[in-house]
């Protein structure tokens, strides 16, 4: 886990750091409108947009990811949660963050637009005997008040800022928080394997990364702390067919020609190890974590 602060005088942690003022209105003198820049980059990205049907159909496959991850542990170290906190986990998925966070806070409201993901989260809560997580089915675009989303000590949006209007999403998070807001998003290519895209003849344009978010926060008058998480991954599978099926879904709507190219690439890059098929190379996915305090 790496950490970086734009202003070295500010100290990160529960007792340090300059609090943000209330987000202001953009002025012409501010130069680049980073929300519009975000929208433009979003419109040019080549990565497929995954809707609710995608996540419902693939929930269990994505829950059983073919690699171990240090992301949640590192995020919690940055977050430094308090036992008395109520937390909103927006875009919670199957509970990658909510499940480990539950033992450190008073109550979590976990929100996602995928019923399949929420079902997996509730199953885990039952299995692990976790009784302080409540779920709400809602999206970024919904009226949060009408969905029962209120105010919370801390608000989290972890790896889920897949929105067209970033400023509006940030304002929703900010307004729902009493003390702090935490968001995380991709750095560079994020979780996307550039070599995999090139192997099937596709150009990887993952869309806007963290710098758009950070610059927009600054433009809105929010002086956010900035840290980085490096999440190492080396995917492993039971067999070649399982690997091919996984990446076929991840890349999205492959043609027959692309499927042949993908299979050839995997045959070349997968090696047998301890009864599984493992990619020869290990990748480091970097995530940017930004957080700020309410005044």
Task: Enumerate the language-model features and the residues they cover.
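A short glycine-rich, Lys/Arg-flanked "PGG" loop and its adjoining helix->strand segment in the class I
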Residues: 167-182
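A short SAM/SAH-binding and catalytic strip from SAM-dependent methyltransferases
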Residues: 152-167
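Short alpha-helix
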Residues: 206-221
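Class I SAM-dependent methyltransferase SAM/SAH-binding core
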Residues: 96-142
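Conserved Class I S-adenosyl-L-methionine
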Residues: 225-295
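Short, glycine-/aromatic-enriched active-site segment of Class I SAM-dependent methyltransferases
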Residues: 186-204
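Conserved class I S-adenosyl-L-methionine
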Residues: 4-82, 84-93
């Amino acid at each position: 886990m790496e950490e970086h602060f734009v202003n070295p005088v500010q100290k990160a942690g529960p007792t340090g750091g300059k609090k943000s003022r209330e987000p202001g209105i953009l002025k012409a003198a501010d130069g680049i409108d980073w929300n519009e820049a975000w929208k433009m980059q979003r419109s040019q990205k080549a990565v497929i947009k995954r809707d609710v049907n995608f996540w419902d159909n693939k929930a269990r496959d994505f829950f059983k990811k073919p690699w171990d991850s240090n992301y949640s542990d590192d995020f919690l170290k940055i977050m430094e949660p308090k036992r008395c906190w109520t937390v909103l986990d927006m875009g919670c998925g199957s509970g990658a963050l909510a499940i480990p966070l539950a033992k450190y806070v008073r109550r979590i409201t976990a929100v996602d637009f995928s019923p399949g993901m929420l079902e997996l989260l509730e199953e885990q809560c039952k299995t692990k005997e976790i009784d302080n997580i409540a779920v709400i089915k809602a999206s970024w675009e919904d009226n949060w008040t009408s969905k029962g989303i209120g105010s919370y000590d801390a608000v989290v949006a972890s790896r889920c800022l897949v929105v067209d209007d970033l400023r509006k999403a940030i304002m929703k998070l900010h307004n729902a928080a009493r003390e702090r807001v935490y968001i995380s998003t991709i750095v560079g290519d994020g979780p996307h394997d550039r070599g995999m895209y090139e192997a099937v003849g596709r150009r990887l344009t993952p869309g806007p990364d963290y710098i758009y978010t950070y610059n927009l926060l600054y433009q809105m008058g929010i002086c956010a702390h900035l840290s980085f998480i490096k999440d190492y991954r080396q995917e492993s599978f039971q067999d070649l067919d399982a690997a091919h099926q996984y990446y076929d879904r991840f890349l999205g709507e492959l043609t027959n020609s692309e499927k042949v190219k993908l299979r050839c690439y995997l045959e070349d890059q997968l090696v047998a190890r301890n009864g599984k098929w493992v990619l020869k190379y290990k990748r480091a996915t970097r995530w940017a974590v930004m957080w700020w305090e309410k005044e």
